[in-house]
Structure formats: C-alpha cells, structure tokens
Amino acid sequence: MTSSPVSRVVYNGKRTSSPRSPPSSSEIFTPAHEENVRFIYEAWQGVERDLRGQVPGGERGLVEEYVEKVPNPSLKTFKPIDLSDLKRRSTQDAKKS
C-alpha cells in the first residue's frame, strides 16, 4: 500500500458572522451539527475571500491550493459531483416514495 499526501483545510482563525438559514420542517439538526456546518461555511467563505484578494504572481498569500505531485492512480476515474444537486435529487426521491 502506498501512502499519498492528504489534503487538508487550513483555517486561519478569522471568524465572521453569517446569516442563519431558517430551519426546514422536515430536517432537525442538533446544535453540534449546526455549529459544525457553520464553522465549515465560515472557514470556506474565508478561503474564497482570501483567494479573491490574492494578486497573481504576487508574494505567497494566506491560501495555497494543494496539488499532488504524483497523482493517486486510485483516483484516475474520479468524477467530481455537485453535492447540492445530489441532495436536491435525494430529497426529491424521498418525497416521491
């Protein structure tokens, strides 16, 4: 078995407030789940903001995209999916049944 580098999100600790979405009547989430989702959302918004603020060719910024030097052969056939679309489809399928 070969080991390959693991990509990870690096969070710089900045926190901003974000609007809370109204709860859906069919979905009940624990406070811990909501906090995890909020943390990931805020962290990703910070990453996107930092990426937009970086000057191409300038000095190294806060955010750096990780790219493997040697691609993992197991991922050769990997096709990215839109998670929002997947959730939408699974929700529609659940309502049909």
Curated annotation (Swiss-Prot):
Modified residues (Phosphothreonine): 30
Gene Ontology CC terms, in alphabetical order: cytoplasm; cytoplasmic stress granule; nucleus
Pfam families listed in its UniProt record: FAM195
Keyword Acetylation appears in the UniProt entry: yes
Record key words, sorted: Acetylation, Cytoplasm, Nucleus, Phosphoprotein
Residue positions where Phosphoserine is found in the record: 21, 24
Primary location: nucleus
Residue numbers of N6-acetyllysine PTMs: 79
Region annotation (Disordered) ranges: 1-30
Compartments where found: Nucleus; Cytoplasm, Stress granule
GO BP annotations listed: regulation of epithelial to mesenchymal transition
Assembly, per entry: Interacts (unphosphorylated form, via the PXDLS motif) with CTBP1, competitively inhibiting CTBP-ZEB1 interaction. Interacts with CTBP2. Interacts with MCRIP2. Interacts with DDX6.
Protein name: Mapk-regulated corepressor-interacting protein 1
Organism in which the protein naturally occurs: Homo sapiens (Human)
